[in-house]
Amino acid sequence: MALMAALNDPTPTGSVTGPVVGFDLDMTLIDSRPGIRATWAALAEQTGAHIDADLVVTRLGPPLEQEMAHWFPAERIPAMSELYREMYPTYAIEGTLPMPGVHETIAAVHAAGGRAVVVTAKYEPNAKLHLAHLGIAADAVVGNLWAEGKGEALREHGASVYVGDHTGDVRGARTAGALSVAVTTGPCDAAELRTAGADVILSDLTAFPAWLAGYVAQERA
């Protein structure tokens, strides 16, 4: 409960002497594919709709409503999105795994005197459930934002770096004037991320603490 309360408070609890680093959630901090697949499968069973859940999890990142448009007519999308979000805690939280290096990455940000802020397209209450369940100690969470829309939240929190796995995350970083650090753990490969304008490309988060140490040293030089 204490962690959930902390995630609902966007204000720093102490002085910030290091960088504010923004992070995407799905396929950046967490591997949510098993849980998302299970939720879509349950939605298909409940509604009788044909949904290829295996295909769905190959293109995570954009807002839920965009994916819904592949499986439901426009007039049903709001209701189906609401139903999906209601079903999500039952089917998705337990099956989701932390990405390799996630805890070390957040610890590195804190060790540098910084803050870790999650900015995600996911429904915010469900994003917070994931972080609490996996013990990922983010300092703030902002949900329901995608691509350029993430820029406002990143600016509000003073993020100088944004880490994500999708070209939409690169666009969000660019909009905020933040350094774009891309990881190739999601649907976009290194070439796509580079073409989109990523400043740094890492294979996964296990490489992030060393990169951050170099970045902080350079900024303080």
Task: Briefly describe each language-model feature range.
Residues 108, 130-133, 153, 172-175, ...:
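Well-formed, non-transmembrane alpha-helical positions, independent of function
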Residues 113-117, 138-140, 158-160, 178-180, ...:
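Short active-site oxyanion
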Residues 145-157, 167, 171:
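Short loop-to-alpha-helix "cap/lid" segments that border enzyme active sites
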Residues 55-56, 136-150:
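A short, structured active-site edge motif that brings together acidic residues
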Residues 5-103, 112:
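N-terminal helical cap/lid subdomain that shapes the substrate entry/recognition surface
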